[in-house]
C-alpha cells in the first residue's frame, strides 16, 4: 500500500527476493581485513555471502565451481597470489561464469598482465583494484578494462591526500619526489592504549586530522595517484630507496615467472642489494638475463635485482601476503 514495494506472499517469493542483489564470494580467509570487510558490507546491504567448499586452502576448481553453482556476481581475491592459480583453473575447465560481474583485488597488488588475462577469459567482468588498510579502511580504487589495465595507479578523490616527507604540509598535484599517502574524513580514534603510535599514524596537519598507514606515493599533475609501496619493505641500495613491490611487479611481468618476492641483503658495494626470490611457471627455464631484460622495461636499471634465487614455492600467509622475513632469509643464504 501507499505505493511501497510489493511484499512477498509466499515462501518461494521470499527466497527469490532474498537471493537477488549482491552475491559475494570473498575467497580469502575472514581473518583478513578484505575478507571480513566485504562480508560485512554484503550483509549490511542485504546481499548474500557465499563461502567455497574448501575455505582452508586456495582451490581454484572449488572457487570457480562455487561461483558457477551459486551464481556469485562478485569475487574477492588478494593480488597475484590468488590470481595465478585462479587463472590456471580457468584454463583447465570450461564453466558458465556469465553471472560474475566484478572481481575485486585487495590486500596486495594485482599485476596488469594478470588483469588482462582475466579480461581475455571474461571480457564483461569489471576488474577492480582496491587499496586500504586496517588504520584507514578502504582508500583507493581503480577499474580496469581490456587493453588499458595498469597497476599501482589510482584516480584521486577528495578524501585522499599526499603529505610531505616530514608530515608538515599537504603536497599539491605535480609535486617533486614522493610523499605519504594519507586520508581525511571519518577516521578511527587510534590505537587502544598506544598514544605515541596514534600520534604518528593519525597526525594533525594545519588543523586537519589524517591517517597515514605507511604507503609512499606521488600525486601526478593529471590527478592520478601513483602508489610506490610500503615504506616498511623498502630497500636502501647505493643511497636510493627501492620499493620491493615495484621490483616484484617488474619481475612478474615476465611470462615465465609464476610468483616473486623481493628482499634486501647486505652488500659491501651498495650497503644493501636487491634480491628477487622467484618461482617459475612449471616447465619454464629462462635465464637470469631474460628476467632482468623484461624487468628493465618497467623500472629503472638501478632497481634491478643483483641476484635471482629460484625456489619451488613462495611462502605466503593464508591471505596471500608475502612473508618478507622468509624472503630476507632466503636472500641472505643464497
Could you say what each language-model-derived stretch is?
Residues 68, 101-130, 134-225, 230-234, ...:
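Conserved AMP-binding/adenylate-forming
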Residues 27-28, 52, 78, 105-106, ...:
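Short hydrophobic "strand-cap" motifs at the C-terminus of beta-strands
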Residues 102-105, 262, 309-310:
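Hydrophobic/anchoring residues in structured secondary elements
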Residues 18, 22-25, 50, 55, ...:
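Conserved helix-loop-beta element of the AMP-binding
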Residues 65-68, 75, 84, 132, ...:
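AMP-binding/adenylate-forming catalytic core of the ANL superfamily
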Residues 23-25, 181-182, 277:
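Short, well-ordered beta-strand segments
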Residues 48, 73, 101, 125, ...:
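Short acidic/polar active-site loop segments enriched in Thr and Asp
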Residues 1-26, 31-74:
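Conserved AMP-binding/adenylation subdomain of ANL enzymes
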Amino acid at each position: 500500500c501507499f505505493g511501497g514495494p510489493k511484499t512477498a506472499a509466499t515462501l518461494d517469493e521470499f527466497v527469490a527476493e532474498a537471493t537477488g542483489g549482491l552475491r559475494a564470494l570473498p575467497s580469502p580467509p575472514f581473518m583478513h581485513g578484505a575478507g571480513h570487510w566485504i562480508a560485512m558490507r554484503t550483509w549490511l546491504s542485504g546481499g548474500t555471502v557465499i563461502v567455497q567448499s574448501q575455505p582452508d586452502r586456495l582451490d581454484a576448481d572449488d572457487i570457480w565451481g562455487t561461483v558457477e553453482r551459486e551464481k556469485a556476481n562478485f569475487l574477492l581475491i588478494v593480488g597475484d597470489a590468488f590470481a595465478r592459480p585462479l587463472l590456471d583453473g580457468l584454463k583447465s575447465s570450461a564453466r558458465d561464469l556469465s553471472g560474475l560481474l566484478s572481481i575485486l583485488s585487495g590486500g596486495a597488488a594485482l599485476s596488469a598482465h594478470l588483469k588482462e588475462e582475466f579480461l581475455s577469459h571474461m571480457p564483461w567482468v569489471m576488474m577492480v583494484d582496491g587499496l586500504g588498510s586496517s588504520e584507514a579502511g578502504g582508500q583507493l580504487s581503480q577499474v580496469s578494462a581490456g587493453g588499458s589495465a595498469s597497476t599501482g595507479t589510482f584516480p584521486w578523490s577528495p578524501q585522499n591526500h599526499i603529505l610531505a616527507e616530514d608530515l608538515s604540509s599537504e603536497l599539491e598535484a605535480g609535486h617533486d619526489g614522493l610523499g605519504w599517502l594519507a586520508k581525511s574524513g571519518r577516521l578511527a580514534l587510534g590505537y587502544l592504549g598506544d598514544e605515541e603510535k596514534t600520534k604518528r599514524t593519525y597526525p594533525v596537519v594545519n588543523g586537519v586530522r589524517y591517517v597515514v598507514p605507511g604507503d609512499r606515493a606521488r600525486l601526478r599533475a593529471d590527478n592520478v595517484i601513483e602508489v610506490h609501496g610500503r615504506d616498511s619493505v623498502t630497500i636502501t641500495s647505493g643511497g636510493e630507496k627501492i620499493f620491493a613491490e615495484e621490483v616484484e611487479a617488474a619481475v612478474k611481468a615476465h611470462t615465465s615467472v609464476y610468483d616473486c618476492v623481493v628482499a634486501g641483503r647486505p652488500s659491501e658495494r651498495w650497503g644493501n642489494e636487491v634480491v628477487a626470490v622467484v618461482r617459475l611457471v612449471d616447465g619454464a627455464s629462462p635465464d637470469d638475463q631474460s628476467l632482468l631484460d623484461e624487468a628493465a622495461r618497467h623500472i629503472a636499471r638501478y632497481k634491478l635485482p643483483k641476484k635471482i634465487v629460484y625456489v619451488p614455492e613462495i611462502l605466503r600467509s593464508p591471505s596471500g601476503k608475502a612473508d618478507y622475513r622468509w624472503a630476507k632469509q632466503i636472500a641472505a643464504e643464497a
